[in-house]
Every structure is written in C-alpha cells, then in structure tokens.
C-alpha cells in the first residue's frame, strides 16, 4: 500500500498495486479521499470549504495564482487586443500608406462588389471564425467531462482546483483556457494582418474602380510618366478607397486559416481512435471551410492570389504556435509529468531486470559454496552429452580461450625438441571456489577426519573403462597457486587478482641421471598479509588446445569422447571421492607406523590401482600438520644433495623412457595422476633430503602420486613424482584439491598462482 499526497500538499490517497502496475498506472489512479470516522475534516480538505461543499471521490488542488493571473494578466491582454482591433478595423484613426500605381492598370481595374453581395462578409467571417471553433470546443469538453466522470475513480480526469473559495472543475477550466486562447489568437491574427496591410498599402484588384483617378490633374501625361505616386482619386467613398489600399495579406484568409488549424489540432488531440472516420471528417471540414473563405476573396476580386496564400501561411502559423505552446497541444496539464514518469519507469525496469537475473544466479550458485564441508562433499553435476556441456548457464559454464588455438598454446616436452622460450599466453579464467580456512592444525585434522568419515560410508565401486589406444587426448599439466583470497561470482566465476602462472620452459630431457644445468626453473611469489584459503577448483569443461594444422586430431578426440562419455554417466561423485572410496575398500589408504594421525592418498589414472606397500622415495610429498613453532613445513624428498634449487628432469632408474613427460603423443593413455596438495606455510622455507621410508615424528598428511605400468597394448601412464626429482621450498597459502571431470577429453590444469621472480627455490 503506497501513500501519496495531492499537489496541494494536504491531501492523502491510497494507491493499491502501485508496485505491480508501475509508475504510469500508479500515477493515473485516482486518489480516493476518505472521511474521518468522527465526521471531522477529511484529508486534502481546503480551509475555505466545508465537508458538504467538497465533492465526493474527487481530488481537489488548492491554487493561489489561478485567479490573480486570470484577472490581472490574461484578461488585460485579451482586452487590449480587442480594443486595438476595434480602432484598426472600425475607425479611421490609422490610415494605410498611399502607394503608387500605374496608369490604367488593368489588374487594379476589376469590378467592385458591394459588401452586402459578398459571399462571406467580414462580420460573418468574425462570427464564424470565433463562434464555430468556440462552440465546438465547449461541446467537445462537455462530452469528454461526462464520459470521464462516469468512469470508475475518474481515471484520466483532471483534478478540481479550489481558488478563492471557488471550486473549478476540469470542464470549466479547460473550456475557458481553450476558448480564451482561441479568442486571443483571432485578435492577434487580425491585428497582425491589419498592421501589415497598413504598412504596405498594397492596392486591391478593384482599387482603380473605387478610386476614380483624375489623370488630367497631373502635370505630365501618363505616356511620359506611367507610374503615379500622387493621390489623384476623385471617388466619394473614402472608406471604400481606404479598404482598397489594404489588400495584402487577405484578412479573410488569415482568420479562416487560424480557426481551421486551431480546431483541427483540438480534434486530433482530444478525439480517440475508436471512430476511425469521425476525426478526419471534422478536420477536413474545417480546413475546407477555411480554404473556401480565402478563395472567395479571389473570385470576387477582393484580393490577389498572393494575398490569399500569404494569409493562409500567417494564420496557420499563429494557430500552430498557440496550439503547441499556449495550450500544450490540448493535453491535460499534468500530461508532461506522465511522460516523464514513463521515462523513469523504463529506466526502473532496465535496472530491476538485471537485479532479478543476478539474484536468481546468486541463489543457484550459492548452494554449493556455503561452507567447507559443502564444497568437499558436493556432488558432481551430471553432464550427459557434449551438447549439455556447451550450454553456459548457472550450472555449467564453458570457458573459451581468449586467443585462437595455435602453436603458442601448446607446450611439448620431448628429448628431441630444442629448447625454446615461447611467450606465455594468458590462460582462460577458471571457475574456482575459494573459502577461508583456519591455520591451526586442529581445524585441518577435523576437516580431513570428517571428510574420511563421510566417504567411508559410500560403498560405490569405481568403474574404470580402458579407452581406445591412440585416441585419448593429451593432458596439459599446469600449476598455479594463489596467495590472495578469491571470491566467487554469481555464476561461480573466479574473481580475484590477475592470473600469475608458474611457467615451466621446456628443456631437453636427459637420458641419464646427470642433472642438467639448463633445466626449467620455478619461482613462486608470496604476497605478505594475504589470508589463507582452501582453494578447490570447480569441475569445468577444459579447452583442448590444438594447432590449426592438427584439426583432424581434435576430431579424433571428440569422437573418442562421444564413445566413452556414456560410460561415465553412472559416476555422479567427484573423481577424488571415488578414488578415496575405492582405496578404502581395497585397504590402500594406510597409516604410517610412526604416525597415527596422518593419512595417505593414492590416485592413479590407469586401469589398475597400485597399493602403497612399496614406498618409492621420490614420489612422496610430506606436509607437516603439527610442526614446531606452529610453522607448517613442506618436505619434499630429493636424492641430490646439491643443486641449483630448480626443477630438474631425470630419466627413470631403469633407463626406460616410458615415463617421460610428453604431452603431444596421441598414443598415450589419457588417464594420469593429477592429485596434488599444497600445505599452509607462514615461516621460512625449509628443505631436507630424507629417505622416503623415514617418517616424521609428527602427524603427516601425505599425497602420493604413484605411476603404474601400462597394459599389454602399450598404454602408459604419465607420472609426476617418478619422472623427475624435484626440490621445492615454497611459502604456500592455499591447499588445492582438484577434482576430476567425467569427460575423458577434459584436462585438469593444476597451477600455482601468485609467483614472484624475486624469491626462488634454494638448496
């Protein structure tokens, strides 16, 4: 319920449904004035009127300037115009200019027709030009007032105005306003016409007939000087002679044109379109009558044709100006306010529509990121086909690369390719869900314990189907870490600081265990004062970057994806959930004998899973959950005691290149282990070379990446931990737990964000 007051400031009204109908409908609703229960004064009641004098169901506006303006401004102007017209038309106080003429000019020697014999005399013209439009306007206003008064709540009816204790309804005010402007326009048109006629003194076609010039009184003959300037008229009727000197412009034409145009504008603005022919009929009738009035002055030799045409232009121009600017095109006084409200309403609708869309998207995207446990246990949305994945909506968002796919988008590691420093290409923004997490070890243990307990109840078997050899797309491994908190947008878009990626430049892969000084180097930036986050990338459709020349390979990948996508429909859980559940069933998840609080997670993308009974020294990343001095430490075993502190690629111990990290080989198996976990850290980075069998006496959470030998057909699994021995010290602020997509063509890029070239890894 919206409360609104009248323009006078004292009235109040109730408008129901204003929010649903919009500004225009609410403004057009009539405000009902209610009577107080005690018979007291009603809202909006004027001081000078009693309750009985106030019409019921009407909105009354109080005006202080209505009567003073009418009495002291409008009436004097109208009266002065009438008085001036009287002296110009009915008296000889103002005489026209005496202009010259030629001797025996036949264009000025037309017969003179008496006023009583004229088709439209001047007095008749004044009567018709005044009475016709005035009566038409008053009748039209009366009919309009009656029709609007019978409507419910008086919609479209102007409010009454109380001025000086008198109540003026809309009919009276509109009639007086329109008729008064019409009268003023007639007087103004007549005055302008008379002034022009007196100033020019252009002769009428009958001038020589009524003038009767005496050519003998001239000192020279007409043959010697044909143009005569002197007054040689010998006619007895001076009034007729003076009238013959006022031909330009035609007064009949100006008055008729003004009346016709003025009343036509009234019809166009007032009459509705319910009757398609009534409005044109009335308009054409008045226009034709005005034209006839002007043409009769030509046929009866009262004016020249040019005088009539100019009179039409003058009269029509005056009527057009007064109709548009004096009476506002005959529209209600508050119509301009309605038009302004329409503009405001359109702007309001445009502002509200995006808000509704944003609120809907917020509601759909905020369900999965309410808290940490909700993210960890969030069910993976089922993507039934590639068509469903290509829809960008609140559930699924496809991230396309900003640059076209080309050679600069692909990085190939091979022992046959030379080293090349390719400029980095800005990667597409991924949908990441980030939440704030506590730094204490108790909170981390609690989260991991809850996660394990909830997944132990899931007794679902992991179905892994071996893809066809030669058709699995290559995986692109990219590492990113963020040292600043991110926020999740409406669609789940990742909004945060600019993406900073850890780029690994390709180098020659050695064939032996000797370290290469030119290996790829890694530098990570840690911004001070940043908050710690648990960063869990959301499962999205990754882009497969291919060269324009290798479109056939991409077609093969899509074909293979369509064949194997049906096999993954039954897996509604995230990939990491399924791996943990399967590992629990097979007894893979085991604790260290010296560590009762730690846990080991094994994740492989091959057909079979390999238990962790045989520990490999180079494949374990240890995170100290309860360090000394409250400083989480990352311990990465390394077999080298010295080095440059950079990533170094080493050949496998058995001398086989089966585990070489090569992404551009289509014959590889597409499944690879991508499980990586970063730990929190705020102190100095520490690095130690320890054996994999030696465990820390504190609680350790270990994520192991175990490579498994390929099947009989030669499919191999890419491994990170067994293919290289990395020595890494970093100050991590984010724990990344990537999830796996169901589509085999999807690639998971695990990347560190927020790198810094100033702080590198040391020995």
UniProtKB/Swiss-Prot annotation:
One of its GO terms (biological process) is G protein-coupled receptor signaling pathway. It is a multi-pass membrane protein. Keywords: Cell membrane, Glycoprotein, Membrane, Phosphoprotein, Postsynaptic cell membrane, Synapse, Transmembrane, Transmembrane helix. Residues 33-54, 458-529, 669-698, 739-763 are annotated as: Disordered. One of its GO terms (cellular component) is glutamatergic synapse. It comes from the Eukaryota. Pfam families: PAP2. Its main location: membrane. Expressed by glutamatergic neurons (at protein level). Residues 740-749 have a biased composition (Polar residues). This is Phospholipid phosphatase-related protein type 4. The gene is PLPPR4.
């Amino acid at each position: 319920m919206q409360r609104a007051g009248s323009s006078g400031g004292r009235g109040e009204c109730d408008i129901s449904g204003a929010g649903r109908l919009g500004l225009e409908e609410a403004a057009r609703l009539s405000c009902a004035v209610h009577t107080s229960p005690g018979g007291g004064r009603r809202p909006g009641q004027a001081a000078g009127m009693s309750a009985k004098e106030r019409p019921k169901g009407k909105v009354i506006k109080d005006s202080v300037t209505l009567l003073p303006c009418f009495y002291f401004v409008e009436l004097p102007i109208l009266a002065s115009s009438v008085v001036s017209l009287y002296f110009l038309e009915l008296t000889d106080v103002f005489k026209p200019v005496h202009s010259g003429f030629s001797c025996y000019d036949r264009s000025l020697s037309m017969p003179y027709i008496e006023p009583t014999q004229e088709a439209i005399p001047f007095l008749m013209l004044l009567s018709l030009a005044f009475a016709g439009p005035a009566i038409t306007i008053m009748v039209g206003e009366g009919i309009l007032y009656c029709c609007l008064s019978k409507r419910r709540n008086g919609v479209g009816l102007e409010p009454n105005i109380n001025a000086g204790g008198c109540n003026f309804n809309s009919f009276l005010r509109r009639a007086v306003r329109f008729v008064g402007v019409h009268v003023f326009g007639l007087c103004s048109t007549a005055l302008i016409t008379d002034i022009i006629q007196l100033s020019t003194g252009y002769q009428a076609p009958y001038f020589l007939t009524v003038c009767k010039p005496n050519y003998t009184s001239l000192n020279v003959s007409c043959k010697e000087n044909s143009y005569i300037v002197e007054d040689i008229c010998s006619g007895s009727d001076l009034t007729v002679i003076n009238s013959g000197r006022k031909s330009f412009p035609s007064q009949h034409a100006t008055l008729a044109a003004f009346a016709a145009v003025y009343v036509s504008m009234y019809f166009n603005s007032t009459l509705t379109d319910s009757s398609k022919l009534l409005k044109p009929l009335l308009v054409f009738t008045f226009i034709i009558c005005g034209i006839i009035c002007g043409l009769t002055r030509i046929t009866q030799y009262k004016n020249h044709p040019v005088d009539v045409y100019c009179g039409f232009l003058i009269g029509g121009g005056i009527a057009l100006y007064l109709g548009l600017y004096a009476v506002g095109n005959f529209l209600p006084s508050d119509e301009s306010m309605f038009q302004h409200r329409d503009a405001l309403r359109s702007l309001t609708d445009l502002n509200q529509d995006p808000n509704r869309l944003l609120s809907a998207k917020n509601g759909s995207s905020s369900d999965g990121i309410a808290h940490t446990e909700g993210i960890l246990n969030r069910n993976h949305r089922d993507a039934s086909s590639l068509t469903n994945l290509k829809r960008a909506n609140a559930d699924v968002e496809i991230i396309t690369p900003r640059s076209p796919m080309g050679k600069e988008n692909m990085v190939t590691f091979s022992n046959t390719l030379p080293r090349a420093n390719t400029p980095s290409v800005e990667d597409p923004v991924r949908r990441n869900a980030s939440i704030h997490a506590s730094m204490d070890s108790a909170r981390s243990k609690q989260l991991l314990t809850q996660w394990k307990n909830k997944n132990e109840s899931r007794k679902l078997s992991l179905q892994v189907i071996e893809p066809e050899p030669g058709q699995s797309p290559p995986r692109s491994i990219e590492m990113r870490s963020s040292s600043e908190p991110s926020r999740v947008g409406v669609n789940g878009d990742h909004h945060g600081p600019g993406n900073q990626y850890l780029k690994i430049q390709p180098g020659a892969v050695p064939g032996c265990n000797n370290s290469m000084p030119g290996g790829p180097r890694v530098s990570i930036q840690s911004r001070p004062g940043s908050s710690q986050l648990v960063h869990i990338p959301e499962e999205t459709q990754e882009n497969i970057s291919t060269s324009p020349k290798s479109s056939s390979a991409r077609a093969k990948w899509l074909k293979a994806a369509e064949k194997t996508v049906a096999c993954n429909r039954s897996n509604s859980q995230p990939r990491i959930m399924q791996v943990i559940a399967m590992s629990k069933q097979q007894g893979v998840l085991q604790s260290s004998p010296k560590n009762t609080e730690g846990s080991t997670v094994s994740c492989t993308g091959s057909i079979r899973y390999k238990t962790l009974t045989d520990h490999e020294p180079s494949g374990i990343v240890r995170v100290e959950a309860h360090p000394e001095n409250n400083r989480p430490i990352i311990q990465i075993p390394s077999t080298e005691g010295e080095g440059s502190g950079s990533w170094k690629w080493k050949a496998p111990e058995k001398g086989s290149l089966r585990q070489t990290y090569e992404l551009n080989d289509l014959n590889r198996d597409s499944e690879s282990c991508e499980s990586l976990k970063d730990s929190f850290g705020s102190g100095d980075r520490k690095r130690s070379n320890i054996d994999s069998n030696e465990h820390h006496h504190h609680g350790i959470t270990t994520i192991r990446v175990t490579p498994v030998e390929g099947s009989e057909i030669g499919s191999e699994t890419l491994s990170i931990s067994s293919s290289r021995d990395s020595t890494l010290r970093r100050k991590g602020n984010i724990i990344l737990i990537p999830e796996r997509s169901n589509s085999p063509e999807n690639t998971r890029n695990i990347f560190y964000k927020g790198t810094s070239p100033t702080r590198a890894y040391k020995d």
